[in-house]
Each structure stands twice: as structure tokens, then as C-alpha cells.
């Protein structure tokens, strides 16, 4: 008797959705051979049925109503790739209540509604999978869930936004200014027409919240994370960084401080990174995430953190996992809270070196006066560097 195929419902046929469809179609035989489970895409929900698409899809598969996916008793698994939060929330929660496992790559959705969605998943006994939500093609989610399960996570530090990293790399390596680097990123398809979430740090912040949730066993409100973007970084900052032996990267820093009431340090901000540090060599659209565990020590995950095919790879890994667990039941919620609420320390309570650049008059006693003012606030100076006055002559 031939085994009945798993039926998939795909919501969204944008960049990632088309990558998922193309890969499932192109590598169908390979995936069935490796998973030992037959499958087919039964229905695809899109916003506009008349839109021209580069990906050729049979018209009979398309609908502009996602309810047709969730309401179809023959569809076993829902793949949510529509983006945004409100409609995605309705789709995901409706699917979970209908007993259909969900695969999503929606970081904004999980950052905002993760606690509610994970709770519903557990209550309904219906799993949700989200490998593609943080790190694109980098398998960081499953690593935190499984490979590093015996570790207390001391810290997670990394570069998890390809757009900002491309811009900073262009500024640091080629001397480009911010605006020119952004325009180039947009021309190459590495930045959206509206790049706000990438350059203001909030795309990375959404991913950081998901990683912190998995690492420390408790959901965290987005308003607890300190976020600063790269919009105000200039080529001058790179000049001074290079002179001091650093480069500049937009880093996610998640660090646990034992025996403190607000124990979790959680921030996204541009940071000086020593030019000998491995993260300093992560350039262009590549991402890297360093995870330090008490048993495993330091680990590093590196790869393309976004894009059509890398993200599709992560989505499909979850689809295969969902198919296996659906066919051979073994409940998996994606995230089960196991710790009490963990307070997040205020950015003012963190201790870390900072780089500060002053534009001052070229006269005796200026540096001494700056040192005096900083000292009144208990701030010491580790190193100073001054540049010829012509560097700052245009402000």
C-alpha cells in the first residue's frame, strides 16, 4: 500500500516563499528519499492573484484567501511566510487551534506575540517551528533547542543583520559614507526600499529576543531590550576605530549575570570590535553568532543570515521535521517555558568600554578638561587619540 502524502499549505509567495516553493519542487525526490515521507504542496495563498511572478506556479494552486488553507481538512501543515504581524498572527493562531502544525520564519511575529503563540501551541498540543526566524540559513534555533541543551548559556554575541553588516563593511573596507553604502546595498538587493528596521537595529532586536527566549527559558518583552542603530555612524568613526585597532559592527549582546536581580544583559548597538577578533572578519551580508556555554565553551555559527535560498533552506528543514513528527507523533512545541521571569538590566547598569569622539578647539588643556568632566561621573579614560585638525574641519 502506497503511503499517503503529507499535504502542505504555503501562505506567501514573496522572496522567501518563492524560494521554498522552488526548492520543494526542484529537490522533491531528494527530500522524499531523505525523509522517507511523500509530500506535496496542495494550496498556496497569495495577496494578489494577478501579480506577475518570476516563479512559475500552476494557477489551480493559488488562492487569495488563507482561510482556504487552514480550513482544508486535507492540508496537514501550514507554512506561514506572509510577513507582518497582524494577519500572520490570525493565520498562525487559527492554524494551531485547528490542530495544524505551523512553520514560520516571522521574527517580528514571534518577538511581539511569541509568549501567546507558544502558550497556545502547548495548550493545543500543536507544534510551531521557527528555525528561519533568526539567522536565516544558520541553524541556530535547533542548536539552542537540541545540540546545546545541556549547557547554561553564558552569552550570545553576534552579527545577525546582513543589511547593516553590508553597509558597515563597505564603510570600513572601502571608505564609503553611510548614504552611498545604503544605496549600493539597495541596488544589489541587500536592503529593502524602506531599510528602517535593518538600520535602526530592530530587525536584529527581534532576532535577539527569540534567541534570548530559547537560551534562558522565559519570554521577554520587546520594550526591555536596548536598541541603537547604525544611522549615525560616519566614515570618521571608522578612521578613529582603525587607528585604535578596531572596526565597527552592529552587535547583538545577550549575557547572563549570575546573582543579580536583573540578570540579563540584552542590547543591540554598534560596537568597536578588535580587528583580531573573529567577528571583525565577518563582512558583507554574512552573519555570525558566537554562543558560549558552560559545558561546550565557545562556539561559532557562520553563514548567510538572510536571502531567498538560505532562508528557504531553514524553512524546509522545519517542514521536514514537522512532517516526521506529524507522521511519527512526538510532540514538540518549539519552546516550553521552564524558568521564572528573568529581569533585564537597564543599559545604564551595564559595564562596558565605550568609544566617544569629540570635536573640540585645538588648544592646550582641552583633553585635561574632558578628563576632568568625565571623572566627575566616575568615568575613566583607557586611551586617547587625536587626529590632525584637517580631518574635522568640515564637522
Q: Which positions does each model-derived feature cover?
A:
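N-terminal glycine-/serine-/threonine-rich beta1-alpha1-beta2 phosphate-ribose binding loop
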Residues: 1-98
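A short hydrophobic/small-residue beta-strand
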Residues: 101-103, 381
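A conserved regulatory-domain signal marking ACT and ACT-like small-molecule sensing domains
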Residues: 314, 319-395
Amino acid at each position: 500500500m502506497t503511503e499517503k502524502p503529507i499535504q502542505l499549505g504555503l501562505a506567501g509567495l514573496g522572496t522567501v516563499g518563492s524560494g521554498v516553493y522552488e526548492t520543494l519542487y526542484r529537490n522533491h525526490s531528494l527530500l522524499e528519499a531523505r525523509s522517507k515521507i511523500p509530500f506535496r504542496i496542495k494550496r498556496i495563498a497569495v495577496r494578489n492573484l494577478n501579480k506577475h511572478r518570476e516563479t512559475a506556479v500552476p494557477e489551480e494552486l493559488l488562492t487569495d484567501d488563507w482561510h482556504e488553507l487552514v480550513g482544508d481538512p486535507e492540508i496537514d501543515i501550514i507554512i506561514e511566510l506572509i510577513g507582518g504581524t497582524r494577519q500572520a498572527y490570525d493565520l498562525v493562531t487559527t492554524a494551531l487551534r485547528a490542530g495544524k502544525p505551523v512553520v514560520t520564519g516571522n521574527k517580528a511575529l514571534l518577538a511581539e506575540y511569541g509568549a501567546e503563540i507558544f502558550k497556545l501551541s502547548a495548550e493545543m498540543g500543536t507544534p510551531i517551528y521557527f528555525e528561519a526566524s533568526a539567522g536565516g540559513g544558520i541553524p541556530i534555533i535547533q542548536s539552542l533547542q537540541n545540540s546545546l541543551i545541556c549547557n547554561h548559556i553564558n552569552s550570545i554575541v553576534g552579527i545577525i543583520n546582513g543589511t547593516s553588516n553590508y553597509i558597515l563593511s563597505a564603510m570600513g573596507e572601502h571608505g564609503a559614507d553611510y548614504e552611498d553604502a545604503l544605496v549600493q546595498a539597495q541596488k544589489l538587493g541587500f536592503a529593502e526600499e524602506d531599510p528602517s528596521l535593518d538600520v535602526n537595529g530592530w530587525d536584529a532586536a527581534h532576532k535577539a529576543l527569540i534567541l534570548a527566549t530559547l537560551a534562558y527559558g522565559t519570554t521577554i518583552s520587546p520594550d526591555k531590550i536596548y536598541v541603537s542603530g547604525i544611522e549615525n555612524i560616519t566614515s570618521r568613526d571608522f578612521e578613529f576605530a582603525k587607528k585604535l585597532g578596531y572596526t565597527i559592527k552592529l552587535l547583538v549582546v545577550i549575557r547572563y549575570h549570575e546573582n543579580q536581580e536583573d540578570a540579563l544583559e540584552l542590547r543591540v548597538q554598534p560596537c568597536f570590535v578588535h580587528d583580531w577578533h573573529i567577528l571583525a572578519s565577518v563582512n558583507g551580508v554574512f552573519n555570525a553568532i558566537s554562543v558560549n556555554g558552560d559545558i561546550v565553551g565557545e562556539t561559532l555559527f557562520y553563514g548567510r543570515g538572510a536571502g531567498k535560498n538560505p532562508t528557504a533552506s531553514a524553512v524546509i528543514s522545519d517542514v521536514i521535521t514537522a512532517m516526521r513528527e506529524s507522521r511519527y507523533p512526538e510532540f514538540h512545541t518549539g519552546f516550553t517555558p521552564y524558568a521564572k521571569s528573568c529581569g533585564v538590566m537597564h543599559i545604564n547598569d551595564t559595564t562596558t568600554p565605550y568609544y566617544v569622539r569629540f570635536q573640540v578647539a585645538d588648544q592646550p588643556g582641552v583633553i585635561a578638561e574632558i578628563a576632568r568632566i568625565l571623572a566627575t561621573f566616575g568615568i575613566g579614560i583607557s586611551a586617547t587619540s587625536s587626529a590632525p585638525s584637517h580631518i574635522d574641519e568640515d564637522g
